[in-house]
Design a protein with these regions (language model features):
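A cross-family detector of function-defining hotspots
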Residues: 78-218
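Extracytoplasmic soluble-region selector
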Residues: 1-72, 78, 82, 86, ...
């Protein structure tokens, strides 16, 4: 299954009790009282079906439609040397208090920038040109992988399923013709602190942009 796909579990019972459906992970696969499964973020989930006497389990696997990018490394708090050891793909460019990695897909490039504060990884930025193949269905790319938690002043906030990483993306902010998605470590309640996280995202985005000339994003 893919994000937002629906499938019905064809369960029947000879008993007098109704059938119940329970998902082991509702972020990946949500199931209705009628047995309709709706796919969420990528991953696997078990749907337990029971009529009170017999119980069966079926596995749901949600896979991505869009594989535009190599997954970023979220080793927040780690040193530059530790990040270098973990990120083994892309072309490395050493930056001022940051590491840049460029990747190509056809004639288009995208970048990951790993920003450090006091020698520790503090933020990760994904950058690509607005006019590029990556722009098509990019929102769905994010929704396949992250939970949308809200919007504030045009910035959309996302969390990973483990609730350890916050992401911010503003589709109307196209500074220098570039889209930026910033990732930062997450702690606390996303809804109550969304404006604070958006403020943090807005403060870190210019730091990503200052590296563009050296990284030569085309």
């Amino acid at each position: 299954m893919h994000f937002e796909d629906e499938e019905e579990i064809g369960a029947v019972t000879n008993g007098t009790k109704g059938i119940t459906y329970v998902s082991s992970d509702e972020y990946t696969a949500e199931v209705s009282d009628d047995g309709i499964v709706t796919a969420g973020v990528i991953g696997t989930a078990d749907i337990t079906v029971s009529d009170g006497h017999n119980t069966k389990t079926c596995k749901v696997t949600v896979t991505p439609r869009y594989n535009y990018f190599v997954d970023p490394y979220f080793g927040f708090g780690q040193t530059e040397a530790q990040v270098r050891a973990k990120v083994t793909t892309g072309t490395l460019v050493e930056l001022d208090e940051a590491l840049g990695y460029s990747y190509s897909s056809g004639s288009s490039l995208y970048l990951y920038i790993y920003e450090f504060e006091d020698g520790k990884l503090a933020a990760v930025g994904l950058l690509f040109k607005v006019i590029s193949p990556y722009s098509t269905n990019y929102a769905n790319y994010l929704l396949e992988r992250y939970l949308l938690v809200g919007e504030n002043e045009g910035m959309y906030g996302f969390l990973n399923k483990e609730r350890t990483v916050f992401a911010g993306f503003n589709p109307s902010n196209t500074s220098d013709g570039v889209y930026i998605t910033a990732f930062m470590p997450y702690e606390g309640s996303a809804r109550s602190s969304l404006p604070n996280f958006i403020e943090s995202i807005n403060s870190v985005n210019p730091r990503f942009l200052r590296h563009l000339e050296k990284l030569n994003l085309k």
